[in-house]
Each structure stands twice: as structure tokens, then as C-alpha cells.
């Protein structure tokens, strides 16, 4: 028997349940992974709450984990039993001690990277890869705005931007988070609880503002993000932490300077095995060399059965960096 987290109705963290189950055999082109560390991501709360509803209920949760391959389905040639792997684009159900995953969605994990490092960074790192390298390729010495700079994605973005020589201006909600972002490589930070984001961006850039804004907050920062952009700048809306952006009048993009806006996703940028290999190789290289550090605080590691508590803390915005479930 194995253990997983399920929910039978949408709602708050209280809907999460721990259940025992018998894992199915891996189908063709699938592998079965004994998870050693499971990534917790904000998108998991959207699925649980019903903002991004699963196809049916009851449903599992989570798409990211790292572990050891225990079984291999027919047609899988590049992964073997015993391989250390990490994945971030599985079907729902990674909040589990055992999970079946499409083989092409898993990457072989280098020995230099632990299961905990991998599960804490893979989805977030792949996200930063497509944001900074594909959606808009930030350039050396180029200032840009990145919201939630002390979150799991944000801290990796701070480190990656520094490695690229770019100047990340990060928004944060406390002095402690400001220091965390600066330590990770942010060029400047803005405490949105105490400062005007727009006025500070203008001040930092000498009135020029920025070419690109990366916004995972959603409705609360939409207008401010647009006001931080230069003429013909790009608004990259990639999350809804404060709720989705709805009812947008496209005319506002004209009014604020012929702006561009995009709503990218990981699946839109990393779909094929070749795309996953390109992204994961770059991420693994940065982690293995110590350029990107993804150590998880002890108080943000939870037993699998404590997923409910992990979600409560995540949604309270009390976390810094990544959180993990340990089966």
C-alpha cells in the first residue's frame, strides 16, 4: 500500500485528506517513482480551491517530486529502474509516496543534486527558465520588475538574474523578505506595504521605467505593473496569488503606451522531451555549481500527512522560498 493526499470537494486546506491506495502498474511510456521529496507550489492551492478545477473529483494534488524509479512501463528506453529522477509536469497526484509519470516528463537527476534540492526547485526553476530565457530574454545590465521576489520562484529568479548580469527589482512584503531577496541577488527591492511600487520603479530607473514586468500576484498588482512599463513594454502575467485578472479592456494597453501582455505557462514553453532537456540541463548546471541555492528551511519541510498545514502556511504568505512534503 502507498499513501497519497486527495480532496473530494473544492475549498480551503481543510478539504485535503490522507488516504491509503494500491498503485497501478505503470502504463506504456510511464515510469513509477517512489517519491523521496515532493514540491509544494502555489498552483496547487488554485487546483484545490477550484480556481483551476481538475477534470473530476475526487482528485489527487501536486505535479512535482523527486525520487527513485521503481518500475518502468513498456516503451521506455531512456530511464531504468533505480534511476534518480525529478519531474514537475505529471498528472495530478504527486502528493503521494508513489506516483506514475510519463517518462518524457521526468529528468535524470545528477548525483550532485539531492532529492530535496530537486523537488524544491524543479517546477520553479523551469518556470524561471522560460520567463527569463524565453518569454522575454533579459539582458546584462537591464533592469526589470519581478513581483514576489522572496517567494519560491522569486528567489530562484533573483539568483538566475544575477548570473545573467541583469538587474532584478523585486517586490516584497516585509523587511525580512527584502533582505532575503537582496541576499539572493536582487539588485533593488520594494516593500509594497510601505512604498509605492510605481514611484519606486521610476526613482530606481531615473524615470525610464522597465521593459518587462513579471507578475505572479494577479489582480492586486495588474494596474501598477502596467504603470511600471516603458512604451511598448511587455507585461508577463504568470500567476494569480491575489486572484485572477479579469475584465481587462485591451484599450488600456494602448492608453499606457502600446504595451504588450502575455499569459505564459510552463506547458506552453516546455512540452517536448528536447525542451525539457534543454531547460533542466541549464537549471541543474546552475544548482550543481552553487550559483542557484535551493536549501529548504526546516520549518518548511512537512510530513506528507501534514499537507493541510503546509497549505495553510503557504496561503498565509508566511513562507520564504520553497516548501516540501516528505513521504
Curated annotation (Swiss-Prot):
<keyword id="KW-0521">NADP</keyword>
<dbReference type="InterPro" id="IPR020843">
    <property type="entry name" value="PKS_ER"/>
</dbReference>
<dbReference type="InterPro" id="IPR002364">
    <property type="entry name" value="Quin_OxRdtase/zeta-crystal_CS"/>
</dbReference>
<dbReference type="GO" id="GO:0005829">
    <property type="term" value="C:cytosol"/>
</dbReference>
<dbReference type="Pfam" id="PF08240">
    <property type="entry name" value="ADH_N"/>
</dbReference>
<dbReference type="GO" id="GO:0003960">
    <property type="term" value="F:NADPH:quinone reductase activity"/>
</dbReference>
<dbReference type="GO" id="GO:0070402">
    <property type="term" value="F:NADPH binding"/>
</dbReference>
<dbReference type="InterPro" id="IPR013154">
    <property type="entry name" value="ADH-like_N"/>
</dbReference>
<comment type="similarity">
    <text>Belongs to the zinc-containing alcohol dehydrogenase family. Quinone oxidoreductase subfamily.</text>
</comment>
<dbReference type="InterPro" id="IPR011032">
    <property type="entry name" value="GroES-like_sf"/>
</dbReference>
<keyword id="KW-0560">Oxidoreductase</keyword>
<dbReference type="InterPro" id="IPR013149">
    <property type="entry name" value="ADH-like_C"/>
</dbReference>
<dbReference type="GO" id="GO:0008270">
    <property type="term" value="F:zinc ion binding"/>
</dbReference>
<dbReference type="InterPro" id="IPR047618">
    <property type="entry name" value="QOR-like"/>
</dbReference>
<dbReference type="GO" id="GO:0035925">
    <property type="term" value="F:mRNA 3'-UTR AU-rich region binding"/>
</dbReference>
<protein>
    <recommendedName>
        <fullName>Quinone oxidoreductase</fullName>
        <ecNumber>1.6.5.5</ecNumber>
    </recommendedName>
</protein>
<comment type="subunit">
    <text>Homodimer.</text>
</comment>
<dbReference type="Pfam" id="PF00107">
    <property type="entry name" value="ADH_zinc_N"/>
</dbReference>
<dbReference type="InterPro" id="IPR036291">
    <property type="entry name" value="NAD(P)-bd_dom_sf"/>
</dbReference>
Amino acid at each position: 500500500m502507498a499513501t497519497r493526499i486527495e480532496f473530494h470537494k473544492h475549498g480551503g486546506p481543510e478539504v485535503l485528506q490522507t488516504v491509503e491506495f494500491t498503485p497501478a502498474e505503470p502504463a506504456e511510456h510511464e515510469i513509477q517513482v517512489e517519491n523521496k521529496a515532493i514540491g509544494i507550489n502555489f498552483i496547487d492551492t488554485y487546483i484545490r480551491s477550484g480556481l483551476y478545477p481538475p477534470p473530476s473529483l475526487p482528485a489527487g494534488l501536486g505535479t512535482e517530486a523527486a525520487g527513485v524509479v521503481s518500475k518502468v512501463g513498456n516503451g521506455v528506453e531512456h530511464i531504468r529502474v533505480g534511476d534518480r529522477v525529478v519531474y514537475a509536469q505529471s498528472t495530478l497526484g504527486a502528493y503521494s509516496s508513489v506516483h506514475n509519470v510519463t517518462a518524457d516528463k521526468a529528468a535524470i537527476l545528477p548525483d550532485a543534486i539531492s532529492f530535496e534540492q530537486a523537488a524544491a526547485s524543479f517546477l520553479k526553476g523551469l518556470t524561471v527558465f522560460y520567463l527569463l530565457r524565453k518569454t522575454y530574454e533579459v539582458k546584462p545590465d537591464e533592469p526589470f520588475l519581478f513581483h514576489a521576489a522572496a517567494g519560491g520562484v522569486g528567489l530562484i529568479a533573483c539568483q538566475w538574474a544575477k548570473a545573467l548580469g541583469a538587474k532584478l527589482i523585486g517586490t516584497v512584503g516585509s523587511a525580512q523578505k527584502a533582505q532575503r531577496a537582496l541576499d539572493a541577488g536582487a539588485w533593488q527591492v520594494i516593500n509594497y506595504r510601505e512604498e509605492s511600487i510605481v514611484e519606486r520603479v521610476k526613482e530606481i530607473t531615473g524615470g525610464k521605467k522597465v521593459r518587462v514586468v513579471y507578475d505572479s500576484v494577479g489582480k492586486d498588482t495588474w494596474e501598477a505593473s502596467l504603470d511600471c512599463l516603458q512604451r511598448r513594454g511587455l507585461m508577463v502575467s504568470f500567476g494569480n496569488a491575489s486572484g485572477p485578472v479579469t475584465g481587462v479592456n485591451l484599450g488600456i494597453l494602448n492608453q499606457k503606451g502600446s504595451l504588450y501582455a502575455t499569459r505564459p505557462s510552463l506547458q506552453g514553453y516546455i512540452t517536448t522531451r528536447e525542451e525539457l532537456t534543454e531547460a533542466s540541463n541549464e537549471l541543474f548546471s546552475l544548482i550543481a555549481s552553487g550559483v542557484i541555492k535551493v536549501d529548504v528551511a526546516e520549518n518548511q519541510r512537512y510530513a506528507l500527512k501534514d499537507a493541510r498545514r503546509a497549505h495553510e502556511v503557504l496561503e498565509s504568505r508566511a513562507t520564504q522560498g520553497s516548501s516540501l512534503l516528505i513521504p
